[in-house]
Each structure stands twice: as C-alpha cells, then as structure tokens.
C-alpha cells in the first residue's frame, strides 16, 4: 500500500504537516513541539496525525522516531504537485499545507492544523500551492494567517479571487503569523459552534473550498508586523524556490534573539488545541 494510515477508528482526527518540523524549526524545538502536540491531543481526547512520506510511503500518523529519521536523512519539502514523484522515487518528503490538505481529504480527515500558510512572495512570480489546494478542497484549516514574510496585499487579494472563505476566531483582523494585526478585516466568530455552522453550510451547498479559521498568536508572544518588515528589508536573500521560507524564518529568529521562534511555538500549540476542539465537535 502506498498509504499507511494509523488512524484509530472512532476518534476525532486532526491532520498536521511535516514541513513545520523538518524545515520550519530547529531540531530540538521540533521534537519538543511534536511531543507537546501529542500530549495535548491525548489530554483533550482527539488524535493528531502528522503526515509525511518516508522512503516513498505516505504515512498518516508518523512516530517521533520516523520524524527524527526524516530530519537526520533529509527530506524534500513538497506541495501537492510533488506527491506522486516523491512516492514513485522512494523519497523522504515533508508535506506543506497543500500536500497535507490533499492527503487528509483522501482519507477522510476534515480538520488540518498549521502555523501559517503560504501565499504570494514579494517581488517575483512565486505563488504557493497552499492557495490553489485550499481553493479546491473542502476542509477546515486552523492557522495564524499567512506567514509574515509574504506579500500581504497580494496574498489577501488572491484569497478573495480564489473564493477561499476565512473567519477570525475571536478577532476582527487577519493575523500575520507572528503578528496579531494586519489592518485587514475578516468576519469574526466567537465559538467553535459558529465555525461548524459555516462549514456545514459549505457542505450543504457543495462549496468545495477550505475554510480558514484564523487564530492569532498569543498576545504575549506577538512580534509586531512593522518590526518584521524592517528586519526583512535588511536580509539579503540567499535561497530560492521552496527554500526561501525556511531561510527567512531562520534569519528572523536570529535577528530577534529567538522571539519569532517562541512566537511560532506558542501559536502552533494554541492552533493544535483549537483544531482538536473543532474536530471533536465535528465528530459529534
């Protein structure tokens, strides 16, 4: 079998990408996050499955040991487009949001969690597959908005053009990963029940898009977006393609003395909690 699913029958399930662990965080923090996310899922009563490709096999529910193998041996960062190539060639591959949504939907997972989604990069034609996958797959994605390193205006416009619905969870503003505010308004929801009512409406009318549930970084960990923008102006880009985002995130962590790293870990933990709550109430 190409796909090895370790989903336990009857449990509410949340899917999670592998790129955040393999390419988005230092190894020590990545393993700590994996353990903490698993701990949260056990405490709350849902199953968190980390999805990746190991030696050509798609694994839904990777173990800590398998994740460490990917980190040690290396793994390509892949979107939906690259899945069949990675499998056919027997590669290790870390899934991005797009690949995670695609694979989740194929096995019946309706709730996916991440830190920040991809979008439109500034200054060049570089548009993430995350956007096109969200435009064609009905699921619920919990995130803290788009990554702060992107062209915010262009990405926000692209979300509208692609008809991707988004709601702010207890916020009126579109969050920007490390930052709580962007100056762009979004419809606000106050509860998981409101989220599920919107999602059920999508299902009833055949609206095959991803519902983005935007959960801002905790206030005490926020790094204001104007500070992020000033720092980005100072960075000389030494990467291209899929390596741009990991490169910039690493540079920002260095330049902020780890503040962006702490923000990343904090928002991911909160997003896992919210995604689990949504999955549990969806299951009922």
Curated annotation (Swiss-Prot):
GO MF assignments: hydrolase activity, acting on glycosyl bonds; metal ion binding; pseudouridylate synthase activity
UniProt entry tagged with the keyword Transport: no
Query: Which residues make up the binding site for substrate?
Result: 77, 97, 128-130
The prosthetic group or cofactor this protein requires is: Mn(2+)
Annotated Mn(2+) binding sites? 126
Superkingdom to which the source organism belongs: Bacteria
Task: Cite the SUPFAM superfamilies for this sequence.
Answer: Indigoidine synthase A-like
Keyword Lyase: yes or no? yes
Details of cofactor binding = Binds 1 Mn(2+) ion per subunit.
Cited InterPro entries: Indigdn_synthA-like, PsuG
Gene Ontology CC entries for this record = cytoplasm
> Where, by residue number, is the active site?
17, 147
Query: Which key words tag this protein in UniProt?
Result: Glycosidase, Hydrolase, Lyase, Manganese, Metal-binding
**What reaction does this enzyme carry out catalytically?**
D-ribose 5-phosphate + uracil = psi-UMP + H2O
Its GO biological process annotations read: nucleobase catabolic process
Q: Where is the signal peptide?
A: none
Q: What is its EC number?
A: 4.2.1.70
Q: What does this protein do?
A: Catalyzes the reversible cleavage of pseudouridine 5'-phosphate (PsiMP) to ribose 5-phosphate and uracil. Functions biologically in the cleavage direction, as part of a pseudouridine degradation pathway.
Describe its partners and assembly state. Homotrimer.
For this chain, the family text in UniProt reads: Belongs to the pseudouridine-5'-phosphate glycosidase family.
Q: Which PANTHER family match?
A: CARBOHYDRATE KINASE PFKB DOMAIN-CONTAINING PROTEIN, ZGC:136858
Descriptive protein name: Pseudouridine-5'-phosphate glycosidase
Organism expressing this protein natively: Thermotoga petrophila (strain ATCC BAA-488 / DSM 13995 / JCM 10881 / RKU-1)
**Gene field:** psuG
């Amino acid at each position: 079998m190409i796909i090895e699913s370790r989903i336990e029958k009857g449990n509410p399930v949340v899917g999670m990408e592998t790129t955040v662990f393999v390419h988005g965080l230092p190894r020590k923090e990545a393993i700590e996050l994996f353990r903490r996310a698993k701990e949260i899922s056990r405490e709350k009563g849902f199953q968190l499955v980390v999805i990746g490709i190991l030696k050509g096999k798609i694994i839904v529910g990777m173990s800590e040991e398998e994740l460490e193998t990917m980190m040690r041996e290396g793994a390509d960062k892949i979107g939906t487009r690259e899945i069949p190539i990675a499998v056919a060639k027997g590669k290790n591959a870390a899934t991005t949001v797009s690949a995670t949504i695609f694979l989740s939907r194929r096995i019946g997972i309706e709730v996916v969690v991440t830190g920040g989604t991809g979008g439109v990069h500034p200054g060049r034609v570089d548009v993430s597959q995350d956007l096109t996958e969200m435009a064609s797959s009905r699921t619920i994605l919990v995130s803290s908005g788009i990554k702060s390193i992107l062209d915010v205006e262009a990405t926000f416009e692209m979300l509208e053009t692609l008809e991707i619905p988004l709601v702010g969870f207890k916020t009126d503003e579109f969050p920007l990963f490390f930052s709580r505010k962007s100056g762009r308004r979004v419809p606000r929801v106050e509860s998981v029940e409101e989220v599920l009512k919107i999602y059920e409406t999508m299902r009833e009318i055949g609206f095959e898009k991803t519902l983005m549930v935007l959960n801002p970084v905790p206030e005490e960990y926020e790094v204001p977006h104007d500070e992020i923008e000033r720092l980005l102006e100072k960075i000389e880009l030494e990467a291209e393609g899929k390596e741009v985002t990991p490169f910039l995130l690493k540079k920002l962590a260095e330049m902020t003395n780890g503040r962006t790293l702490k923000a990343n870990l904090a928002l991911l933990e909160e997003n896992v909690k919210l995604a689990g709550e949504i999955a549990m109430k969806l299951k009922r």
